[in-house]
């Protein structure tokens, strides 16, 4: 009998990833109105046109560092799923403690 059995931890055959999404510059998904709403929440009244690209680049570097740390926690625990606690611990490691998600 082939397959992974009940545990699902084995290597198995792999199989084809049929619906693998092509990753392009997804940072453009953070739209101009979304950035404007975040700025409004922070109390900003007028926004320069140059702010949008700068905000996207800063957000991208911040998320890359948090995700890198969260994935490191996940790999250390020998898991494949990043949990909310991994993100909480990654943020805490960077000095940005987040409350309300356990830990």
Curated annotation (Swiss-Prot):
GO terms for cellular component: nucleosome; nucleus. Its main location: nucleus. The modification N6-acetyl-N6-methyllysine is found at residues 6, 13. The modification N6-glutaryllysine is found at residue 92. InterPro entries: CENP-T/H4_C (IPR035425), Histone-fold (IPR009072), Histone_H4 (IPR001951), Histone_H4_CS (IPR019809), TAF_TATA-bd_Histone-like_dom (IPR004823). Keywords: Acetylation, Chromosome, DNA-binding, Methylation, Nucleosome core, Nucleus. The modification N6-methyllysine is found at residues 6, 9, 13. Coiled coil: none annotated. Gene3D superfamilies: Histone, subunit A. GO terms for molecular function: DNA binding; protein heterodimerization activity; structural constituent of chromatin. It comes from the Eukaryota. SUPFAM superfamilies: Histone-fold (SSF47113). It is found in: Nucleus; Chromosome. Glutarylation at Lys-92 (H4K91glu) destabilizes nucleosomes by promoting dissociation of the H2A-H2B dimers from nucleosomes. PANTHER family: HISTONE H4. The nucleosome is a histone octamer containing two molecules each of H2A, H2B, H3 and H4 assembled in one H3-H4 heterotetramer and two H2A-H2B heterodimers. The octamer wraps approximately 147 bp of DNA. Core component of nucleosome. Nucleosomes wrap and compact DNA into chromatin, limiting DNA accessibility to the cellular machineries which require DNA as a template. Histones thereby play a central role in transcription regulation, DNA repair, DNA replication and chromosomal stability. DNA accessibility is regulated via a complex set of post-translational modifications of histones, also called histone code, and nucleosome remodeling. Belongs to the histone H4 family. This is Histone H4. It comes from Blastobotrys adeninivorans (Yeast). The lineage of its organism: Eukaryota, Fungi, Dikarya, Ascomycota, Saccharomycotina. The gene is ahsb4.
